[in-house]
Amino acid sequence: MKKLVFFLVCLFTMQVVVADNDKPVTFEQLPQAAQSFVKKHFADRNVAFSKMDKDIFDVTYDVMFVNGDKLEFDKQGNWKEMKCKHGLVPETAVPAQIVKYVKTNYPEAKILQIEKDRYEYEVRFMGHRTKRFFQWSGKMGERF
């Protein structure tokens, strides 16, 4: 019983220590790929701040714009999520197959958020309560 309590205390302590590892970074301290992506697709928006978030096994970078829009990048600078609260995700930043599918099947829809993980893209639209999932190939798909 003592070992179990000790283990739980250690586990809780580790969670507290790791929980807040956000570190402000300048735009120039972001990975080069992230800097290029922002300059190419979000040049019309002003960066409010950027931060590095260190987890136990991973590092991510967040870029927040003055208008509230947010980008998240992995440690190599590849985008993981684009979330636009007061704007739209630029079509140039979205994979071409997804843009084509959305224009064909939802001509009035505008992309507000897109997130990618290891298996798929998740897309949310303005004016639609639904979200759509796309396989890495860009094909509309069911969730795995």
Residue locations for each model-derived region?
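Bacterial Sec-dependent N-terminal signal peptides
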Residues: 1-22, 38
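Interaction-mediating elements
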Residues: 20-144
